[in-house]
Amino acid sequence: MEFGVFDHLDRYGGALADYYEDRLKIAEAYDRAGFHAYHLAEHHSTPLGMAPSPSVFLAAVAERTRRLRFGPLVWPMPLHHPLRLIEEICMLDQLSGGRLDIGFGRGAAPIELEYYGVAPQDAQEIYAEAVELVIKGLTHKVLDFKGRRFSFSGVPMELEPLQKPHPPIWYGLHAPESAERAARRGLNVVSLDPTNEARLAIERYRTIWRQVHAPASALPKLGLGRFIVVAPSDAAALAKARRAYLVWHESFTHLFRRHGRAQSHPRPASFDLLTERGQGIAGSPATVAEFLARELSATGCNYVVGQFAFGDLTLTESLQSIGLFASEVMPLLRAKAAVGAKEMAGVAAHGRR
């Protein structure tokens, strides 16, 4: 059982330079605590995302950490030129000693695409072609490509990734249909959706995976993304989470309210409603571990992705939450996972008799 982190890098006020420094201190804490990877969102012209260029912030993360893997979740491909992205991927992977993960998407916020002059209805086609192009560029010395959106002939690929054939690829799940595409390609995935929706997508992923890949193939990471606040008591954790989530939600809905549009992927307006939908938990280590164990069992995910820094949570509050999660929640969940694996092995052995 491994654990990751998801971060919007959402702003709540104060000097921006101080904010970045605090977030880098939090990244150092993730590294010390033994988290597997740090997954960073990309957003534009909104307080929801203070990392409109994930590569820049991730380069700083690479410098401040030693073991933590990291990467975008996701790069919205219609907003990135594929050739430049190929070069950035190679640089980040080499600079970090091969700790980069890469995530691609079409862009979840139509308003942000429109700011860049991209028609939302074109996003899927651009995404599909750009991803194919980037993977080809990472695995060939010379890039030749002809598509509807991009065409290149004889472009030398002077840079190369350290990880071969390329860094691990991630995709954000929102529906069973996207799960099917990801499973066929063997991508790692993360779902931020409510319990039942995540379950349906992960079930579809596992079904297609078994049909397409060899039985001995290692199952990719199936991530369960959840807001998490840990404190010594349930009451203390809830008070922090309720306060901070309201601030985060203001940032999340900022562009939609500004333009009078409905949210493309709505989130509940309160932390209590979020918890009812299975998308967040605040409590003592025991409470958080029990919740996550239920969610993992219900959805079929095998990788916990916590959002520990959001809204107006202070540096001290986030560091306390991360520390308690690492020292008390992680061991509880790993013990439960070990028991489950042992039981499954016993069932399999009995079936072979």
Where do the protein language model's features map onto the residues?
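N-terminal beta1-alpha1-beta2 module of alpha/beta enzyme domains
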Residues: 1-70, 164-167, 343-350
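Flexible, glycine-rich active-site loops centered on histidine and acidic residues
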Residues: 2-18, 78-145, 149, 189-191, ...
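Conserved, mostly hydrophobic/aromatic
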Residues: 3, 30, 34, 42, ...
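Hydrophobic faces of well-ordered beta-strands that scaffold small-molecule active sites
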Residues: 3-7, 38-40, 70-72, 100-104, ...
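Short, acidic/polar
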Residues: 17-29, 173-180, 287-295
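Acidic (Asp/Glu)-rich catalytic clusters
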Residues: 31-32, 58-66, 89-99, 183-184, ...
